[in-house]
Amino acid sequence: MALMTGEQYLESMRKLNMQIYMFGEKIENFVDNPILRPSLNSVKATYDLAQMPEYEDLMTTTSSLTGKKINRFTHLHQSTDDLIKKVKMQRLCGQKTAACFQRCVGMDAFNATFSTTYEIDEQYGTHYHDNFKKFVEYVQDNDLTVDGAMTDPKGDRSLAPHAQADPDLYLHVVERRPDGIVVRGAKAHQTGFSNSHEVIVMPTIAMGPDDKDYAVAVAFACPTDAEGIFLIVGRQSCDTRKLEGSEIDVGNSEFGGTEALVIFDNVFIPNDRIFLNGEYEYAGLLVERFAGYHRQSYGGCKVGVGDVLIGAAALA
């Protein structure tokens, strides 16, 4: 499949059946919702820019797995030059949207999970790395947007996941079956989940052997509209102004970001989408590697938004 255009991205999102709730009601048409649409426009920009010849070198690259042309947001970094182009791409997207364009967490999750699954397989003889490579190829071939979910509600932070009064405060495995696992819990502050085709769920802290049944010691991927997933959209400053049809207090009217509490209510994950399952000693390593990549991402996107603010101030 060729790289999607921005309009093709929007049409692909219309085909998803996500369970999204806002103001106590289910959102039936989230793509055209006035509050949610600016967030989708930010992701759309990453597709539009990839179609422009002047930005091709930053926005696209060659897949290390298939040799095909791909969007750089789905790339597995191969060199220092890749990392430099990554951060320049993020600055460009920040300059073009003056907002969060919501694909950085998924990209950073890709690269952290790729190396971690290799090391788990080396120690335990598992097949997580092959599972993950097949998932990445699927994402690249279909030019999909992938969210990364890390933060659990946590509850009492002085206690480990298994010691919480409510077991659902950390996403955890409630059933192991021959064909996969069933998980329950939530991930909080999920930027871009409602604008993504797939999600990679990762650990949120390091842990010990008593926590191996928790999704904090599990990594997996699933469609964002998988059965049992529900999104509760968080509030933004002046968000209801977008419903009034005026320009007062709207801020950045075209682009924006949304966050959601994502509930996993007994969601089934097949074996070929599992990348870590109870190997608790690798939970902290995966978190640490993700954090390193993600700190670099902030050095690009926030600088791009800063460029816009500096320019606006200069014109004021």
Describe the residue ranges of each PLM region.
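Conserved structured core elements
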Residues: 30, 126-129, 133, 193, ...
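Buried hydrophobic positions in well-ordered alpha/beta secondary-structure cores of metabolic enzymes
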Residues: 24, 183-185, 264
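A short core secondary-structure module
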Residues: 186, 190-243
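Glycine-rich, mobile lid/loop segments that gate access to catalytic sites or pores
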Residues: 114-182, 186-193, 209
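Structural beta-strand/beta-sheet cores of well-ordered domains, especially the beta-sheet scaffolds
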Residues: 18, 144-146, 179, 197-199, ...
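Glycine-rich beta->alpha junctions and the first turn(s) of the following alpha-helix
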Residues: 245-316
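Internal helix-loop-helix
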Residues: 48-146, 198
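Acidic/polar, glycine-rich intrinsically disordered N-terminal extensions of enzymes
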Residues: 1-61
